[in-house]
Structure formats: C-alpha cells, structure tokens
Amino acid sequence: HSSSIDDNRKIVRFLKTGLHKVGRFLLPYLVDTYIGCSTKASEWMFPRKCIDSDSYYLLHNAIDLDLYDRNINLGLEVRQKFNIPKDALVVGHIGRFTPVKNHSFIIDIFKEVLKQNPNSYLFLLGDGVERHKVESLVKLAAISDKVIFMGYVNNTVEVMQAIDIMILPSLFEGLPLIAIESQALGIPILVSDTITQEVVLTDLCTTLPIDNPEQWAHEIMSKFGKNKYIDYRSRIKELGYDSCVAIKKIENIYKGKQ
C-alpha cells in the first residue's frame, strides 16, 4: 500500500522519495499481486512490467452510492446553521490542510469569485498542518466572514448538500473520492488537470490548469444556478465505482478467481 509523498520539509521529502524508489525497485521480488486505484497512481507505484503482468488489477476507489441521495431541505438546514442565505453561492473543498491540496490557490480562486459575486461563501472541510497558514491568508484578504473552517466533519454528505460547486485544485492525487462523491450527489466539481482523467465520470466534472485563479472563478460562475439535478448514480455504478461491486471484485482477487 502507498500514499503520496506529501511533506513540505525538503529533507523528509528527499528521504521519502529515495525510499519510494528503492521500494518500487524491490516490489517485483516481494509482491505477487498488484492493485491500483487509478492508472496514474499505479504508474507512480509499480514498475511497468508489474502493470503489464496478469497479476495487476485496476480497482477504482468506490463509494456506497445508496448514501448519496440529493436532499435540498437538508442543504438549507446546513445553510441556516451558518447563517448563509438561500440564494448565496457556496463553494466547497474537502481535504487535509497540506501542501498538495493547494489551499493558497483555493483562496485565490475564491477572492476572484467574490469580485463577481459578493454573495458567496467558502466551506473548507478538513484539518492539518497548514490550517493556520490558510487562516492567516483569509484574514489578510479580509474575507473571514465569507470563509468557514469546519475542521474534521463526520457527516460530509450532509454538509455537501449545502454546496453549489466543489473545487479540487490539488497538485497531484491518486483517485480522489471527493470527485466521485460530488458527481454521485449531482454537484459540479472542478479538478486540476494534474489529477487522473479517470475521475471524469459525468459532465459534472471539469478539469482546469492550476495557473489561473480567474479561469476557475469564471468556470464557477458559469455553472452557478444553471445545474439541473441529474441522478448519475446508475452510470457511476456501471463504471465500477460502487462499493458493493468493488468489494466483490477484491474478494475474487483474494480468492484467486480473477
């Protein structure tokens, strides 16, 4: 199992990168089955000969689609809790406060959104080492009344009901669940073009470069208020992102039936 090398300390990154290269070289001699959540993540983790072998399986990150019912009333309740008007634009991001999540760019995007629509709010769900840094950026921009730091949230699906559009301008990701969850709920999501195209399951997901916050803000405004809810869960299930399907597939891998 692996996860991204997400650390802004140069020495730690250097050491972890070195260990990754060594581990990647040794994998064919130590492991007999390879499972990746996306093609991009697999290419980072496994040597090419492992991916091309019969022992490699692509098993997408999956969710329990039954939990993702769109509930407008629940969304309004969440907005009322934070004194957010019914007609306001709510932009959301879910993720740890670490360098790879690119929170400074998120703040730049939201500042541009506010120029076009002052009746806008930003939900930031998650916690981490860079939270205080991001809070300082928000305070410096004098938009503290527009940005809500929620910390770790157990009921993310409930909070997402109040969000109009999700953004994920990460520097890199494997296959982010939030992109799947957003589309399952019928919420448009913008993701960076550094993320695997495998997250684009429906027309709700748009990829953008992470060098122009104005472009992101323009895309957000172009989608706000124009999204007619469509239940894409059947399509998402067909594409293999339902947890029931994924569980059965991994059971078969363990039993040697695949």
Please tell me what each predicted stretch does.
Residues H1-Q258:
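Membrane-interface segments of envelope glycosyltransferases acting on lipid-linked substrates or membrane lipids
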